[in-house]
């Protein structure tokens, strides 16, 4: 027996509400590698840290990896870039706001391209918001060597990077299947938002994790420039295209096995 989209999503909403009640005091921050146009960047995997509202958490320290670091402070964020100071900056949460503070680094901490303090001077805490750009240090000798590149990161707060299940996601998945297997739908083929030409079967397509699709030829320059990250032109979601497959939500597999998509055009 299959479930309707509405019934399945209702169950998912109830489950999400239950989980949110359990983790109501737990908030998160994620740093993902930011690749700007014509700029070198120190590459790193996405980093997620959690903060408990009810506990007196220590600040999340950011600094350079050294041989003395033994991983004892699991919340610390360390990079192997030599332009990052040993104790470069710290992040903390206070009064419902995330803050970044430079701890007297020599090469500087930049928030949205603005330096927080002079060299070797501790800055005041500055509030950070979702999608802010954080930079640690500055490129040395043009950044031609990887270990002498600054660290640029996009800030994502409180699970904002997670894609929630929605009727749109389900309908887009079914539409793409029908597009490949059975040709265009009765309402007409969709358009690529870059070239405004129809997206048709047998074309090379790129489908983002948010289910928005593009002609691969149209989107390829953007993918090459920002790989392995991609910011969708339509919904502005920021994706890690090299995220391990096993990190996928198990509920998606259950959804594809059990849920059916209602076809309004057939009524």
Curated annotation (Swiss-Prot):
Kind of enzyme, top EC level? transferase
Where does the protein principally reside? cytoplasm
Which is one Pfam family of this protein?
zf-RING_11
Under catalytic activity, the entry for this protein gives: S-ubiquitinyl-[E2 ubiquitin-conjugating enzyme]-L-cysteine + [acceptor protein]-L-lysine = [E2 ubiquitin-conjugating enzyme]-L-cysteine + N(6)-ubiquitinyl-[acceptor protein]-L-lysine
Keywords in UniProt for this one? Cell cycle, Cytoplasm, Cytoskeleton, Metal-binding, Transferase, Ubl conjugation pathway, Zinc, Zinc-finger
Zn finger (RING-type) start-end: 192-236
**Database matches in SUPFAM superfamilies:** RING/U-box (SSF57850), SMAD/FHA domain (SSF49879)
Q: GO CC terms for this protein?
A: cell cortex of growing cell tip; cell division site; cell tip; cytosol; division septum; mating projection tip; medial cortical node; meiotic spindle pole body
Report if keyword Transferase is assigned: yes
GO MF, one term, reads:
zinc ion binding
Record keywords: Magnesium included?
no
Q: What is known of its domains?
A: The FHA domain is required for the proper localization at the SPB.
Q: What does this protein do?
A: Probable E3 ubiquitin-protein ligase which is a component of the spindle assembly checkpoint, required to prevent septum formation and premature exit from mitosis if spindle function is compromised. Inhibits the septation initiation netwok (SIN) during spindle checkpoint activation. The effect appears to be mediated through preventing the SIN activator, plo1 kinase, from localizing to the SPB.
What name does this protein carry?
Probable E3 ubiquitin-protein ligase dma1
């Amino acid at each position: 027996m299959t479930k309707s989209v509405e019934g399945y999503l209702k169950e998912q909403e109830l489950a999400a509400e239950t989980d949110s009640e359990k983790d109501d005091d737990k908030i998160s921050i994620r740093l993902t590698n930011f690749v700007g146009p014509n700029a070198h960047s120190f590459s790193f995997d996405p980093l997620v840290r959690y903060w408990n509202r009810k506990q007196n958490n220590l600040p999340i320290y950011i600094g350079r990896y050294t041989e003395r670091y033994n991983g004892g402070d699991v919340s610390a964020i360390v990079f192997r870039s030599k332009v990052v100071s040993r104790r470069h900056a710290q992040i903390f949460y206070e009064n419902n706001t995330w803050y970044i503070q430079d701890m007297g680094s020599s090469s500087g901490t930049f928030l949205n391209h603005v330096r927080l303090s002079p060299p070797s001077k501790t800055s005041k805490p500055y509030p950070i918001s979702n999608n802010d750009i954080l930079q640690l240090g500055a490129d040395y000798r043009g950044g031609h060597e990887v270990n002498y590149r600054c660290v640029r990161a996009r800030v994502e707060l409180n699970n904002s990077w997670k894609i929630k299940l929605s009727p749109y996601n389900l309908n887009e998945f079914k539409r793409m299947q029908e597009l490949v297997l059975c040709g265009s739908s009765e309402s007409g083929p969709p358009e690529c938002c870059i070239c405004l030409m129809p997206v048709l079967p047998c074309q090379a397509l790129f489908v983002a994790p948010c289910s928005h699709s593009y002609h691969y030829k149209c989107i390829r320059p953007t993918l090459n420039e920002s790989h392995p990250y991609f910011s969708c032109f339509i919904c502005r979601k920021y994706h890690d295209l090299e995220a391990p497959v096993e990190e996928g939500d198990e509920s998606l597999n259950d959804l594809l096995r059990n849920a059916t998509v209602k076809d309004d055009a057939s009524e």
